[in-house]
Amino acid sequence: MSQSTSVLRRNGFTFKQFFVAHDRCAMKVGTDGILLGAWAPVAGVKRCLDIGAGSGLLALMLAQRTSDSVIIDAVELESEAATQAQENVAQSPWLERINVHTADIQQWVTQQTARFDLIISNPPYYEQGVECATPQREQARYTTSLDHQTLLTCAAECITEEGFFCVVLPEQIGNSFTELALSMGWHLRLRTDVAENEARLPHRVLLAFSPQAGECFSDRLVIRGPDQNYSEAYTALTQAFYLFM
């Protein structure tokens, strides 16, 4: 896919090595997903799982960041989104490495014998509240179809002993998610608090949990500098993906 043609495509987001159409997905490509896909630790991974794949963004980002031997499974409950994810994968350089499954993750994990050393999810985080325009968007935004305890349980069922389970969440919800994970036997190993600029409090948090205990490394990421341009740290993290960075 050449940049000269892909940059003109609509109803999606053009990255340096792939295009993500998202017009049939409830949740669109956004900063949260891009942060998570660029941040998740991939060193030494052999098999990855994307829970709630949506458009396939995270699976595609992981494919770009990992070697040709790494297999990625992407599970999406909503059929229209799963179909679009399959189409996005088919048009990418990594068709042979990414498997998109239209399935309920709770049922899907019970059928798996393989274990994953990296599991990634940009999960729903709102409790039932303001009505959404469509049932698909409600499913993507609210925890009614996949609450956080169920998500943590599903990840625990198919992760390797030294694997990482990575999520991105709003700051306060991330704190309660961490408390829940610790109570279920997970160990927090990586935490990055994300702020829009130096003057603002963090609004998102990137979290990596593991079944294996170990030191927790924490840091802070500022997206924009005083000049409102992307910060050096954010640029370093995401420049392999953004088309004009």
Curated annotation (Swiss-Prot):
<dbReference type="GO" id="GO:0016430">
    <property type="term" value="F:tRNA (adenine-N6)-methyltransferase activity"/>
</dbReference>
<dbReference type="InterPro" id="IPR002052">
    <property type="entry name" value="DNA_methylase_N6_adenine_CS"/>
</dbReference>
<dbReference type="InterPro" id="IPR050210">
    <property type="entry name" value="tRNA_Adenine-N(6)_MTase"/>
</dbReference>
<keyword id="KW-0949">S-adenosyl-L-methionine</keyword>
<dbReference type="GO" id="GO:0032259">
    <property type="term" value="P:methylation"/>
</dbReference>
<keyword id="KW-0963">Cytoplasm</keyword>
<comment type="function">
    <text>Specifically methylates the adenine in position 37 of tRNA(1)(Val) (anticodon cmo5UAC).</text>
</comment>
<dbReference type="Pfam" id="PF05175">
    <property type="entry name" value="MTS"/>
</dbReference>
<keyword id="KW-0819">tRNA processing</keyword>
<comment type="similarity">
    <text>Belongs to the methyltransferase superfamily. tRNA (adenine-N(6)-)-methyltransferase family.</text>
</comment>
<dbReference type="GO" id="GO:0003676">
    <property type="term" value="F:nucleic acid binding"/>
</dbReference>
<dbReference type="InterPro" id="IPR022882">
    <property type="entry name" value="tRNA_adenine-N6_MeTrfase"/>
</dbReference>
<keyword id="KW-0489">Methyltransferase</keyword>
<keyword id="KW-0808">Transferase</keyword>
<dbReference type="InterPro" id="IPR029063">
    <property type="entry name" value="SAM-dependent_MTases_sf"/>
</dbReference>
<protein>
    <recommendedName>
        <fullName>tRNA1(Val) (adenine(37)-N6)-methyltransferase</fullName>
        <ecNumber>2.1.1.223</ecNumber>
    </recommendedName>
</protein>
<dbReference type="InterPro" id="IPR007848">
    <property type="entry name" value="Small_mtfrase_dom"/>
</dbReference>
<dbReference type="GO" id="GO:0005737">
    <property type="term" value="C:cytoplasm"/>
</dbReference>
<dbReference type="GO" id="GO:0008033">
    <property type="term" value="P:tRNA processing"/>
</dbReference>
